[in-house]
C-alpha cells in the first residue's frame, strides 16, 4: 500500500487546555489505562455511523466498499498498535479542530477545579470526557493518517504528536478512506501488544458496537512458525438496543452507556423500551450518576442520539428531551421518521413531539421509581441534578405535578442543610388546622435557618421549608400549590397564624397594638417613603424588628437574582414590622427626644434590612446611629 508524504508540513501548538489535559490524564488515569481502546473504538464507530448516513444521499462515498468496520493490529518489533476504520475520515481543518483543541465551553473553569489528587482528578476528567486524547495514557507518540470519504487519495492528512506542547500536520497520500491511528507504545502500554489482551479489552468494552471489530491474528504451524494471518472478528457487532432486553446483562448496558456518553462512571439507572403502535420506536435512556462539568453552561450540548430504522442520523438531538432533562443520555431509534430528517424538520414534527412526550414521561417515571425504592440513591441524583430538574416547573406544565413530587428541600424538621425533604412528607406532617405549606427563601442555608421570620413557627412547632438555591424564588412563581395545599412565603405581609393562637393571646395583642399606635406613627413619620408601611408584629421572640414585602410585590431573593443577571429590578418597598414586646423597642418607645428616637429607628431598620438583604444602601447612616446610641 503506497502511502507517502506530499508536502505542506507545519508545526502547531496545542491549545493550553489540551496540554493540561494530556499531563493530567497520563498521571490520573494510568490505573484505568485500558479505557483508551474503548474510546478509540467508540470514535471509529461514530465515524462509520456518519459515513453510513451521508452515503444515503451519495452512495459514491463508499468508494466501492460498504462493509464498515474497525481493524486492530499490532507490531511487537516496531512497538506499535494500530486502530483503523473505514468511516467518514477527516480533512485538514477537521484534524486541527478535533485533535488540536478542546471545543467545549467552560473548559478553563473545569481545569481550575483539578488538583493533584489522582483519584479526584480521574473522576473529574471522566465527567469531562477525553476521547482521542486517552491514547496518550499508553503511547508516548501518536500518528493519525486520515482521508475524508470521497476525497482524492492525495488529499489525506497526517497528524503526529508526542503529547508535549505541539503537533505536526502535513498532507499525505492514503489509498483507503477513513482513519488509521498508530500508537507508539510506552513501556507501560506494551501489554496491549498481545492478541489475548486486546480480545479481553474489546470483549469487555466494545462487544455492543454495531460494526465488526476485528484483530489481525497470526496462526502458527506445527513447528511453531507463523503462517499467513487473517482478520478475526472479536465482537458481536449487533447494536445493543436492537437485542431482546432479557438477553442483555447489566454490564453490557453499563458499557454501552460509556460509549454513548463518554463518561467513565456507571450510570445511575436506565430504561430500555421497544414501543409498537401509533409510533414504532426503541428508546434506551440513561440517567448519569454525576453531572457533566458544563451542565449549567448555555452552550452545553445535550440530547439523544437519533437513529432512523437503525441508521445513525445525528448526535445531540435535543428535540426529544426537554431542557430540564438535558442530563439524560441515550438514544432513540424511530421507524416513523424519514432518513433525511433535519433538525429544523424535527422541531415541528408531530412524531417528534409524540416521542418527546413519551421519553419525558419515561424519565420522570424512572426518577419516581428510584425515589420510592432507594431514597439514598435518589438523594445522590438530586445533589447532582436537582437544580436543573427544578426548571421543569416553568417548562413543562403537563408534568408539573410529577416534577413537584420529585423536588427535595431542607426544612426546620431536620437540623441539616441536606435537601432531603419531599413535599409529600411535609404535607403528611402538617398540623391539624394547617392548610398551607410555609416556606422561606434565602441566600444560604445558614441565613435561612437563623432567619428571624422563623421565630414564631419554632415556638408553635410549625415546619417551614427552607429554600436557598439561587433559582428558588423564581421557582415559587410557578409552584403555587401541592396536593391541594397553597404555598405561603413567611416573609410576606399577608402571613396569618391567628388560627394557631388562643383568644387570650389575640386580645393581648390587640391591646398592645393600640398602646403602640403612637410609636408606629412616629416611626412612619421619621422614615417617610423609605418604607411602605410601619406596623407592630407578634411573630418575633428574640428579634426587635423585621422587614417584609406585600404578597404581590417582588421579594428580596428575586430582586437579587435579577440584579445578578444584569437585569433591572424594581425597587422593593418594604413593610417595617416592630416587636412591641422586645426590650429595644420599648426603649425606643420611651425616647421623648425626636432626634434620639430617629437614631433608634435607623439602627433597628438597618438591622432588619441586614437580616433580610445582607446589605444596606447607606451603611454610614446605620453605623452613625448605632455609634451614637452606644456612646450615650
UniProtKB/Swiss-Prot annotation:
GO cellular component, one term: cytoplasm
Key word Transcription regulation present: no
CDD domains per record: HATPase_Hsp90-like
A single GO molecular function term of this UniProt record: unfolded protein binding
Region described as B: 344-560
Keyword vocabulary terms for this entry: ATP-binding, Chaperone, Cytoplasm, Nucleotide-binding, Stress response
Region (C): 561-632
Subunit structure: Homodimer.
NCBIfam families reported for this sequence: PRK05218.1 (NF003555)
Name used for this protein in its record: Chaperone protein HtpG
Organism: Aliivibrio salmonicida (strain LFI1238) (Vibrio salmonicida (strain LFI1238))
Amino acid at each position: 500500500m503506497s502511502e507517502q508524504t506530499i508536502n505542506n508540513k507545519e508545526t502547531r501548538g496545542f491549545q493550553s487546555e489540551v496540554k493540561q489535559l494530556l499531563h493530567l490524564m497520563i498521571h490520573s488515569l494510568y490505573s484505568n489505562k485500558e479505557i483508551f481502546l474503548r474510546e478509540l473504538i467508540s470514535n471509529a464507530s461514530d465515524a462509520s455511523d456518519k459515513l453510513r448516513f451521508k452515503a444515503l444521499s451519495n452512495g459514491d462515498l463508499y468508494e466501492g466498499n460498504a462493509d464498515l468496520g474497525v481493524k486492530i493490529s499490532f507490531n511487537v518489533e516496531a512497538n506499535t498498535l494500530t486502530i483503523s476504520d473505514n468511516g467518514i475520515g477527516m480533512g485538514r481543518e477537521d484534524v486541527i479542530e478535533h485533535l488540536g483543541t478542546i471545543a467545549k465551553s467552560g473548559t478553563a473553569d473545569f481545569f481550575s477545579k483539578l488538583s493533584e489528587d489522582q483519584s479526584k482528578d480521574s473522576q473529574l476528567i471522566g465527567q469531562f470526557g477525553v476521547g482521542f486524547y486517552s491514547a496518550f495514557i499508553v503511547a508516548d507518540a501518536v500518528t493519525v493518517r486520515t482521508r475524508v470519504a470521497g476525497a482524492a487519495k492525495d488529499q489525506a492528512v497526517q497528524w503526529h504528536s508526542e503529547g508535549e506542547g505541539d503537533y505536526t500536520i502535513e498532507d499525505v497520500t492514503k489509498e483507503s478512506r477513513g482513519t488509521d491511528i498508530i500508537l507508539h507504545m510506552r513501556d507501560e502500554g506494551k501489554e496491549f501488544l498481545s492478541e489475548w489482551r486486546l480480545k479481553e479489552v474489546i470483549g469487555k468494552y466494545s462487544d455492543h458496537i454495531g460494526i465488526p471489530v476485528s484483530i489481525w491474528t497470526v496462526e502458527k504451524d506445527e513447528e511453531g512458525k507463523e503462517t499467513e494471518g487473517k482478520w478475526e472478528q472479536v465482537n458481536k457487532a449487533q447494536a445493543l438496543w436492537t437485542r431482546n432486553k432479557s438477553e442483555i446483562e447489566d454490564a453490557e448496558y453499563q458499557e454501552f452507556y460509556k460509549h454513548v456518553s463518554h463518561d467513565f462512571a456507571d450510570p445511575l439507572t436506565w430504561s430500555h423500551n421497544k414501543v409498537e403502535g401509533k409510533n414504532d420506536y426503541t428508546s434506551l435512556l440513561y440517567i448519569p450518576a454525576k453531572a457533566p462539568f458544563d451542565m449549567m453552561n448555555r452552550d452545553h450540548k445535550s440530547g439523544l442520539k437519533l437513529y432512523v430504522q437503525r441508521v445513525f442520523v445525528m448526535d445531540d438531538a435535543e428535540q426529544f428531551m426537554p431542557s430540564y432533562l438535558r442530563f439524560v443520555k441515550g438514544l432513540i431509534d424511530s421507524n416513523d421518521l424519514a432518513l433525511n430528517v433535519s433538525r429544523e424538520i424535527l422541531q415541528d414534527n408531530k412524531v417528534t413531539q409524540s416521542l418527546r412526550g413519551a421519553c419525558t414521561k419515561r424519565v420522570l417515571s424512572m426518577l419516581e421509581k428510584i425515589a420510592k425504592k432507594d431514597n439514598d440513591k435518589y438523594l445522590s441524583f438530586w445533589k447532582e441534578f436537582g437544580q436543573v430538574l427544578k426548571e421543569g416547573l416553568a417548562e413543562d406544565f403537563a408534568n408539573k405535578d410529577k416534577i413537584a413530587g420529585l423536588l427535595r428541600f431542607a426544612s426546620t424538621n431536620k437540623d441539616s442543610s441536606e435537601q432531603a425533604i419531599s413535599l409529600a412528607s411535609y404535607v403528611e406532617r402538617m398540623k391539624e388546622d394547617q392548610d398551607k405549606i410555609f416556606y422561606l427563601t434565602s441566600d444560604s442555608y445558614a441565613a435561612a435557618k437563623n432567619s428571624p421570620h422563623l421565630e414564631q413557627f419554632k415556638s408553635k412547632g410549625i415546619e417551614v421549608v427552607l429554600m436557598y438555591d439561587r433559582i428558588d424564588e423564581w421557582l415559587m412563581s410557578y409552584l403555587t400549590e401541592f396536593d391541594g395545599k397553597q404555598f405561603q412565603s413567611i416573609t410576606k405581609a399577608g402571613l396569618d397564624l391567628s388560627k394557631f393562637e388562643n383568644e387570650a393571646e389575640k386580645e393581648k395583642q390587640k391591646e398592645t397594638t393600640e398602646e403602640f399606635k403612637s410609636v408606629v406613627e412616629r416611626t412612619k413619620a421619621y422614615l417617610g417613603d423609605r418604607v411602605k408601611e410601619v406596623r407592630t408584629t407578634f411573630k418575633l421572640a428574640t428579634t426587635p424588628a423585621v422587614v417584609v414585602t406585600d404578597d404581590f410585590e417582588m421579594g428580596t431573593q428575586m430582586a437579587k437574582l435579577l440584579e445578578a443577571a444584569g437585569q433591572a429590578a424594581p425597587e422593593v418597598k418594604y413593610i417595617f414590622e416592630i416587636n412591641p414586646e422586645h426590650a429595644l423597642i420599648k426603649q425606643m418607645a420611651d425616647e421623648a427626644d425626636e432626634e434620639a428616637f430617629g437614631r433608634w429607628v435607623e439602627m433597628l431598620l438597618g438591622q432588619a434590612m441586614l437580616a433580610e438583604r445582607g446589605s444596606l444602601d447607606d451603611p454610614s447612616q446605620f453605623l452613625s446611629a448605632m455609634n451614637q446610641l452606644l456612646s450615650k
